Amino acid sequence: MNKELLWEMLATPSASGRETELGKKLYGYAGTFSHQVRTDEIGDVVAVLNPDCDFRVLLAGHMDEIALLVTAVTQEGFLRVNRTGGVFAPLYPGHKVQVITERGPLYGSVVFTREMAKKEDLAPKDLYIDIGAKSKEDALAHVSLGDPVIFDTDCRELLNGCVTGRGMDNRAGAFIVMEAVKKAREMGCAVGVYGAATVGEETTMNGAYFVASRVKPSLAIAVDVTYTSDYPGVDTAATGDVRVGGGPVLVNNPSCHRKLQRLLRRAAEKQGIAVQTEAATGRTGTDGDVIHKTGKGVPFSLVSIPLRYMHSPAEVGSLADIQGCIDLLAQFLADLDPSLDLTWY
């Protein structure tokens, strides 16, 4: 596994709508193994294999992360914020953060009071960020309204091949997409492959729409994270039994294509990879939901990384699960025949 790349991706700020720094790195990396590298007006990065093939497979993993957004500054120089994506405000008081400005990161601390800790309905708009400014004018000399704010946390390797950090949702998925495309080429993949690190999934899903509208894929696989049930306080009867370290997760739901599911399972068997299954009753909540409805419709499925504590500053996943997703998808791509017929009857 290219741990150096994964660690670099997890360390790079990529708030939804501000993915440029990470996108530039992936654009350069994709050029080392793909036949083409493409981008678009909003910053998606696409590694392409066999661009002349009419049978096109889109892999999509979003590279953006949730964040706060600076909305105002008090007369005393404290920053007011609101959410960008699925932010849970009670996690923030007392934490170190980075404000991502045009000049680079600016560090701060989220104001903490005991009264705030007791508040049951704490919302992002209730938070204040202390950057050490002496006044509103002092703060605005360094920060602009609209600047994103992310947790200032590091990635660390834990016991048994686990890893913890901010924004594994879904930089780990974008990493898998790039590495799966690279490995598929090494395995002699013959179909057109478009491995996309998409922008904006946590907010608008515009990245998935831009990519799918241009690629016009024959089929698509979204790569994202999913909740697990292997830690205290989770009811497995309600969530199902999904575990970190248990392997890639495939979802059975009304929109994921059953033939693609079977092909993914077959690829896992070839690689000797254990897979887990989860059930969903409707949308997947991933880029796949948008890709599915572009053009005349795109058959799609979903491969998920088991992840504990999603949208927290210390998400926990498994390096073995990440590698399992890479190997499964590379085998899936290498096995595909351009004559594949996905019609039902």
Protein language model annotation of sequence segments:
Residues 1-345:
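N-terminal hydrophobic/helix-forming segments and targeting peptides
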